[in-house]
């Protein structure tokens, strides 16, 4: 793989002093979790210190907003939360704005700032929880747009190599809810900043049925602000607020199947919800599969399935990782027995050791 090393700046190394930390408020599922060793990364100059510190621990767990992780009751290792701040316009040309955001920026806050400044193109990704740095790892997507569609490049810290590396789309190897980073040793990389190429002129992406049905987008030429507002309204109506009900957003990926499998399923289940993909495959609506298995609104111990969106697993109070994963396994089993399709979880499941 071709990557370019960023020349190191000559600056003092900021020290890191690990401390014990309760992580219940550091994950949107609200799971009880404890880190005996925790550090917050607030400036790039701390990354060399992280490289020096990490080998002393069994594992390094890198956290962003904690919106796409399942944390164990106790983590035997070092937990580093990325809080690097900053948003700036770094370039523009005839067909794109290039906007850079530091990894610790709140994702929705960044999208809002782009809309406010007329840097359009990310509005379909509004209200996705988490941070900018976590977004490329998952290749987040919603309502017809993926991060990869707007990606320019990123800068990441190679923890073992002790260097900053510049990576383009080819190096990141984006796929559906997937990237290069998800196939590396956990804690091997810390994303420092991400740059986005936002199209000029802008065209709305309204392929998703919910957006097509939204009254605010009935006009002939909807603005980016109107799309942003519609996405926020739809998400608030369908998805629980993690500040009120602990959840990690969509817990399962929409499974991809070939045309033959989809046709066979349609023969048995005429109401099957599916979406054609550019490569000829079909994406099945995981929420529909789960709902048809009778899981919407059900509870298993302290974990449950949201009553309005079957893709969302929730913490009903006092849940731990084992409760969430037991519920996920039960759902996977029912869906596979009925449809012959295996659902894959979206969140990263952090091992205790």
From Swiss-Prot:
One MF annotation (Gene Ontology) recorded for this entry: UDP-N-acetylmuramate dehydrogenase activity
Catalytic activities: UDP-N-acetyl-alpha-D-muramate + NADP(+) = UDP-N-acetyl-3-O-(1-carboxyvinyl)-alpha-D-glucosamine + NADPH + H(+)
Places the protein is found: Cytoplasm
Family matches, as InterPro entries: FAD-bd_PCMH (IPR016166), FAD-bd_PCMH-like_sf (IPR036318), FAD-bd_PCMH_sub1 (IPR016167), FAD-bd_PCMH_sub2 (IPR016169), MurB (IPR003170), MurB_C (IPR011601), MurB_C_sf (IPR036635), Oxid_FAD_bind_N (IPR006094)
GO biological process, any: peptidoglycan biosynthetic process
Entry keyword set: Cell cycle, Cell division, Cell shape, Cell wall biogenesis/degradation, Cytoplasm, FAD, Flavoprotein, NADP, Oxidoreductase, Peptidoglycan synthesis
GO cellular component, one term: cytosol
Active site: 177, 250 (proton donor), 346
EC number of this enzyme: 1.3.1.98
Cofactor names: FAD
Pathway: Cell wall biogenesis; peptidoglycan biosynthesis
Chain ranges of the FAD-binding PCMH-type domain: 31-201
Main subcellular localisation: cytoplasm
Family assignment from sequence similarity: Belongs to the MurB family.
Function: Cell wall formation.
Classification via NCBIfam families: murB, PRK00046.1
Protein name: UDP-N-acetylenolpyruvoylglucosamine reductase
Upper classification of the organism: Bacteria, Pseudomonadati, Pseudomonadota, Betaproteobacteria, Burkholderiales
